[in-house]
Amino acid sequence: MIALIQRVTQANVVVKNEVVGEIGHGLLVLLGVEKGDDQQKAKRLCEKVIGYRIFSDEQDKMNLNVQQIGGSLLVVSQFTLAADTQKGMRPSFSGGAAPDKADELYRYFVEQCRQSGVKTEIGRFAADMKVSLTNDGPVTFWLQV
């Protein structure tokens, strides 16, 4: 399971001209589910995302996590993160989980984030989405479990 996380000052996701998820200061989480992923991996990745210390403390050192700053999450499914780009000029998506399994684990990941107490907004699974953000830094990390 993969999370591409971006520290943002604001982010939103639009489906068919309707804002379906929006946050201020926090993390945009692009989530890719791979074959073989399960609830245990989803829970571990959620814990890592929430606990990852990439927000500045008083000394301007990356030392605080999203929960400590009172930030929010915007979680957007993105199957392209599971692509194999090693060969040729076209990505292969054979490493991605089947859509029903990916949806199940995406929802489980979101549920775990919400249970942690962090405000969590979402995109719409398998929809054509327009994601807008203001990357703060820029600060972007690839997390994988």
Swiss-Prot record:
Motif segment (Gly-cisPro motif, important for rejection of L-amino acids): 137-138
GO molecular function annotation: D-tyrosyl-tRNA(Tyr) deacylase activity; Gly-tRNA(Ala) deacylase activity; Ser(Gly)-tRNA(Ala) hydrolase activity; tRNA binding
Regions crossing the membrane: none
Broad class of enzyme this protein falls into: hydrolase
Entry's EC annotation: 3.1.1.96
InterPro entries: Daa-tRNA_deacyls_DTD (IPR003732), DTD-like_sf (IPR023509)
Cellular component, GO annotation: cytoplasm
Any one GO BP annotation for this protein: D-amino acid catabolic process
Catalytic activity, reaction form: glycyl-tRNA(Ala) + H2O = tRNA(Ala) + glycine + H(+); a D-aminoacyl-tRNA + H2O = a tRNA + a D-alpha-amino acid + H(+)
Localization terms from the record: Cytoplasm
Pfam families: Tyr_Deacylase
Keyword annotations from UniProtKB, A to Z: Cytoplasm, Hydrolase, RNA-binding, tRNA-binding
Free-text function comment from the UniProt entry: An aminoacyl-tRNA editing enzyme that deacylates mischarged D-aminoacyl-tRNAs. Also deacylates mischarged glycyl-tRNA(Ala), protecting cells against glycine mischarging by AlaRS. Acts via tRNA-based rather than protein-based catalysis; rejects L-amino acids rather than detecting D-amino acids in the active site. By recycling D-aminoacyl-tRNA to D-amino acids and free tRNA molecules, this enzyme counteracts the toxicity associated with the formation of D-aminoacyl-tRNA entities in vivo and helps enforce protein L-homochirality.
Quaternary state and interactors: Homodimer.
UniProt family annotation: Belongs to the DTD family.
Domain note: A Gly-cisPro motif from one monomer fits into the active site of the other monomer to allow specific chiral rejection of L-amino acids.
Name used for this protein in its record: D-aminoacyl-tRNA deacylase
Organism: Photorhabdus laumondii subsp. laumondii (strain DSM 15139 / CIP 105565 / TT01)
